[in-house]
Amino acid sequence: MVARLIAPQFLVLYAFAASVLTIHHRGKVRLPFGRQLTDHSTIMAPYNVLMYLFSAVPNKPVLPVGVVPELAKLRENWQVIRDEALNLFDEGRIKASEGYNDWGFNSFFRSGWKRFYLKWYDDALPSAQRMCPRTVALLESIPCIKGAMFATLAPGGRLVQHRDPFAGSLRYHLGLVTPTHPGECRILVDGIPCSWRDGEDLLFDETYIHYAENTTDQTRIILFCDVERPLRTRAMRAVNRWVSRHIIKESATENEAGERIGVLNKIFGYVYHVRL
């Protein structure tokens, strides 16, 4: 009986269960356990635990931006970035997906959240290169930035509590156009309130439970980036880059017709239409 319980297939199951419990109990704020079991972060739990074990930055919800010093370049050029974001906003180009081809953020569109992709896991979008070349050039000069977009949250918008599924990155926000009462437009990461302000930035671990709200009458516009998580060993950095390049990259989608849509989003669109 004992020999059967320690058979390789059971050891794999035990390791998976332990990683899911680690994710669930990480931080002060938790999803109901039933929801955690069906959350997409559960699928990535074993990989994410490896990322936490080998992380070269503290495993904390909110981090000093200085742990990734290259990001200072964005803050120093925030007005250049803001001007290009405002042009897109005024032209109505920061928008929700026009089809079911943005699996990662699909649920946000019903909550007043919109986006314009700049790059996604190393590839800059042609529309971004054409419409906001200075911002794209800045992003391309910082290799640790894997994905980036302009993101807006409309007056009254609220994103529900969630955790992102991939711990191979950290999340960076740079305030571009923010409400005059910052305490009323904020993000809470594991219960820690943070507000956006023009020209100020924030770095956090998006695999902690977080949500955002804008209770003002003004639209919030930020630069939103996925930053490669610093890791302690060359081997783990290589693994994480492979996963980013060959799996996470397949969640790419378009700003306008003709741009590349990754395999994961093609599958999502097919499944969504079949379900309907």
Give the predicted meaning of each segment.
Residues 159-162, 204, 210-216:
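Short beta-strand His + acidic residue motifs that chelate non-heme Fe in jelly-roll/DSBH
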Residues 181, 217-218:
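Short strand-connecting beta-turns/loops that link adjacent beta-strands
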Residues 187:
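Aromatic-lined ligand-binding clefts that engage carbohydrates, nucleic acids, or primary amines
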Residues 190-203:
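Short acidic-glycine-tyrosine-enriched beta hairpin
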Residues 2-163, 220, 234-276:
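Fe(II)/2-oxoglutarate oxygenase catalytic core
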Residues 152-154, 165-182:
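Short, conserved beta-strand element in jelly-roll/cupin
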Residues 155, 192, 208:
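A generic "binding-loop/recognition-motif" signal
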Residues 171-176, 203, 218-234:
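A short hydrophobic beta-strand segment most commonly corresponding to one strand
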